Amino acid sequence: MSETAPVAPAAPAPAEKTPVKKKAKKSGVAAGKRKASGPPVSELITKAVAASKERSGVSLAALKKALAAAGYDVEKNNSRIKLGLKSLVSKGTLVQTKGTGASGSFKLNKKAATGEAKPKGKKAGAAKPKKAAGAAKKPKKSTGAATPKKAAKKTPKKVKKPAAAAGTKKVAKSPKKAKAAKPKKPTKSPAKAKAPKPKAAKPKAAKPKATKAKKAVSKKK
């Protein structure tokens, strides 16, 4: 019995540790949401400087007043404001007209503002070639239609074969002419055979004389 008693309190100990981890995760997520909810300091500074109408630029004190009016905690984020000003000056978005570092007056760089606006137009122009590329893809479908044309060109080759057969027919006709030339020689021989026929006709002429002699004999009787 004494051995089973100390085991019971050891079981709830891990159950107490698990909710602590969950709370830590929830608190970390909440802190991340709080940081992500507000805009960055650099954007607030640029908006405040752009809203001012002072030609000489906005001083650090005037900038802090503008940020405080926008609901930004200037006292807690004083170091962030100074770092944001230095980074904006180094990037070229702000121009420091007076002073050095974070102290002094700051003015919005118009060239940088126009330079930022131009790349947006370039991006829009770059989007148009994509549409043109899509239109260029459409003619690829017509290439599929062009393949039947190649097949149509191949079909006349079959028609050329009968032409070759016609050539063979012409060659076959030429021997016929040669055969027709051979019978011309035998035609001369019948002409020679006709020549003796008139000679044989002379004895036939003598037959009537015999008939006349027979008639004369009959008269004498």
UniProtKB/Swiss-Prot annotation:
- According to the entry, every stretch annotated as the H15 domain falls at 37-110
Stored SUPFAM superfamilies:
Winged helix' DNA-binding domain (SSF46785)
Q: Which UniProt keywords apply?
A: Acetylation, Chromosome, Citrullination, DNA-binding, Hydroxylation, Nucleus, Phosphoprotein
Which residues are recorded with the post-translational modification N6-(beta-hydroxybutyryl)lysine? K35, K53, K65, K86, K91, K107
Q: Name the CDD domains for this protein.
A: H15
Q: How is it modified after translation?
A: H1 histones are progressively phosphorylated during the cell cycle, becoming maximally phosphorylated during late G2 phase and M phase, and being dephosphorylated sharply thereafter. Citrullination at Arg-55 (H1R54ci) by PADI4 takes place within the DNA-binding site of H1 and results in its displacement from chromatin and global chromatin decondensation, thereby promoting pluripotency and stem cell maintenance.
The UniProt similarity line reads: Belongs to the histone H1/H5 family.
Q: State the protein's name.
A: Histone H1.3
Upper classification of the organism: Eukaryota, Metazoa, Chordata, Craniata, Vertebrata
Gene (UniProt): H1-3
